[in-house]
Design a protein with these regions (language model features):
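Conserved non-cysteine loop/helix-boundary elements of the Radical SAM core domain that shape
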Residues: 98-299
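C-terminal accessory regions of radical SAM enzymes
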Residues: 14, 22-24, 296-310
Length: 310
């Protein structure tokens, strides 16, 4: 392309160039699977979609990591997911199938009973097909909305129903600090859970209030200290860039605090405006695309600087 056109692109293109409606690592993954070298795959993203070098390098790292994970899988291995569709409150950005406990507490016990039956059926199916569970993840909702006793019943039945001897990762989304205590965490450890995910989304109290959370940043700090002291092998923290009331400076403070807690996984999402979310329905003001870009730029540099990799 003429030099003038390329100069104009630098001024007008968004951070991921012309990529729209596709995960940025997908074209790179396809290129690698077709036999291109990593450098060729990265250049394909730059030349065909005008993705800048830093984002193209990140997409390449993600693609290589996903292909390594895929190569480690065997044909007789499956992943197991259990969903617990209850939360203390419904977050403003949420569109998942989930209910606030205050409105649906009476449904929790019947749901658990039906779930135990489904676990029995699924375990028999896995056994009949000669399959092995490679990984287990419990999400939601917020699984730790269950009481310690309910969680104990659920995990006892799970471990008795499935052969988890080849399970490489046993992860439960602990989610929100207002649902986590020592007793529940001990139940998770006792049943073999080696990875939990604590999801503050932000450590700015103004942002937590804006998204409908009933806990504070100080609560998250206490929960992380407790979780880290109890010996979980891996602890993940989820953050969202672009939440109402957040700023690039506030997001930087959040990420820096997460790094100081010692979590060995940090997942940074960008806010997606979903049709059923309160943010969209109420027209809440959110950060600009430029501000979100600053949050993501800092995420890349700070996490790489702390030796985190995709």
């Amino acid at each position: 392309l003429p030099e003038e056109v390329r100069a104009a692109e630098k001024l007008t293109l968004p951070p991921w160039g012309m990529l729209t409606g596709v995960r940025p690592d997908k074209p790179v993954t396809w290129a690698l699977m077709e036999g291109k070298t990593p450098e060729e795959a990265k250049n394909y993203l730059k030349e065909h979609y005008f993705v800048p070098e830093d984002r193209a390098a990140l997409a390449l790292d993600c693609a290589q990591a996903s292909l390594r994970a895929k190569r480690s899988l065997r044909e007789d291995e499956v992943s197991l997911y259990i969903g617990i569709p209850f939360c203390p409150t419904r977050c403003a950005y949420c569109s998942f199938v989930s209910q606030a406990v205050e409105k649906s507490f009476a449904l929790m016990e019947p749901y658990l009973e039906v779930l135990l039956g489904e676990i029995t059926q699924a375990a028999q199916m896995v056994k009949d097909l000669g399959l092995n569970v490679k990984s287990f993840y419990m999400g939601g909702g917020t699984p730790t909305t269950l009481s310690a006793g309910q969680m104990d019943r659920l995990l006892t039945h799970l471990n008795q129903s499935f052969d988890l001897s080849r399970c490489a990762e046993y992860c439960i989304e602990a989610g929100r600090p207002d649902t986590i205590d020592r007793e529940k965490l001990q139940v998770l450890l006792d049943h073999g859970c080696d990875r939990i995910s604590v999801n503050p989304q932000s450590l700015e109290d103004s942002v937590l209030r804006a998204i409908g959370r009933r806990h504070t940043a100080a609560d998250i700090e206490k929960t992380m200290a407790l979780a880290m002291s109890m010996g979980f092998r891996h602890v993940n923290m989820d953050l969202i860039a672009g939440l109402p009331a957040d700023t690039p400076e506030g997001f930087r403070r959040t990420l820096d605090k997460c790094l100081s807690f010692g979590a060995d996984n940090i997942t940074v999402h960008t806010l997606a405006l979903k049709k059923g979310s309160r943010i969209l329905l109420e027209g809440q003001k959110i950060p600009t695309a430029e501000e979100v870009g600053q949050m993501l730029d800092y995420s890349i540099s700070a996490l790489r600087g702390a030796n985190f990799h995709p």
